[in-house]
């Protein structure tokens, strides 16, 4: 009687639940019938996928090993050329550094005499210019003066030998030293040898107003001079 009471007092054990929410059984790996059927269908696919993944991993490993081998083979061929480049640069760099100041000094030595020669030429031109100007003015006058004879009488025109009155003698006298009539008194009419334009420039320069150096530099208030 006691055993029967104890069995009755025990609660019946509940079956396990499937992840989907239904009741499962120990025979079906604690899954319901539907989930167990789906699980069985997926088993062959799961078995095939690891095999393919393993094959892909094997191929990838083979490719990586081949790449590593290629790099290991090519690296020693490149290393000598890479090492030779810095040596060539190191060899050429001092030559350029040494030639730099040499070229600078050469340029300086070539430029300095040209500057001196230009200065000497400018000085020689400046010294010769004032000497040449009067020569150019005097040279055309000398042959004409030597070719022209002196005027014997100032009462007659040197060009046409017409008689002149006293007023005509004063009006017809030219700066070249000859006397002409009213028809030949202008410089263009008797081929005058005197440089009237140069003379006019000199007179204009002499008549120019020379400004004092103090103008515009000293300031003075209005009324200071008167006080």
Swiss-Prot record:
Database matches in InterPro entries: AN1-like_Znf, AN1_A20_ZnFinger, Znf_A20, Znf_AN1
Ranges annotated as biased composition (Low complexity): 49-59, 66-77
Assigned keywords, A-Z: Metal-binding, Zinc, Zinc-finger
Comp. bias (Basic and acidic residues): 135-148
Lineage, top ranks: Eukaryota, Metazoa, Chordata, Craniata, Vertebrata
Protein name as annotated: AN1-type zinc finger protein 3
Zn-finger segments (AN1-type): 151-200
Matches recorded under PANTHER family: AN1-TYPE ZINC FINGER PROTEIN, AN1-TYPE ZINC FINGER PROTEIN 3
Annotated residues for binding of Zn(2+) 2: 157, 160, 181, 184
Annotated residues for binding of Zn(2+) 3: 174, 176, 190, 192
Source superkingdom: Eukaryota
GO molecular function list: DNA binding; zinc ion binding
ZnF start-end (A20-type): 12-44
Positions contributing to Zn(2+) 1 binding: 18, 20, 32, 35
Biased composition (Polar residues): 78-94, 111-127
Transmembrane domains' residue ranges: none
Region (Disordered): 41-151
Pfam families referenced in this protein's UniProt entry, alphabetically: zf-A20 (PF01754), zf-AN1 (PF01428)
């Amino acid at each position: 009687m006691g055993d029967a009471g104890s069995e009755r007092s025990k609660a019946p054990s509940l079956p396990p639940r499937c992840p989907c929410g239904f009741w499962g059984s120990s025979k079906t790996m604690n899954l319901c019938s539907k989930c167990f059927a789906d699980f069985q269908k997926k088993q062959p696919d799961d078995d095939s996928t690891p095999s393919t993944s393993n094959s892909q991993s094997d191929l990838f490993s083979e490719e990586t090993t081949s790449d590593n081998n290629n790099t290991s083979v090519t690296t020693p061929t490149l290393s000598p050329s890479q090492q030779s480049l810095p040596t060539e640069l190191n060899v050429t760099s001092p030559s350029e550094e040494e030639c730099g100041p040499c070229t600078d000094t050469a340029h300086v030595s070539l430029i300095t005499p040209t500057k001196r020669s230009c200065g000497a030429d400018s000085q020689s031109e400046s010294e010769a210019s004032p000497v040449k100007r009067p020569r150019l003015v005097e040279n055309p006058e000398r042959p004409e003066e030597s070719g022209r004879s002196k005027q014997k009488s100032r009462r007659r025109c040197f060009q046409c030998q017409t008689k002149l009155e006293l007023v005509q003698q004063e009006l017809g006298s030219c700066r070249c030293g000859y006397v002409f009539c009213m028809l030949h008194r202008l410089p263009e009419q008797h081929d005058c040898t005197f440089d009237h334009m140069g003379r006019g420039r000199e007179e204009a320069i002499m008549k120019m107003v020379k400004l004092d150096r103090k103008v515009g530099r000293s300031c003075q208030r209005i009324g200071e001079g008167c006080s």
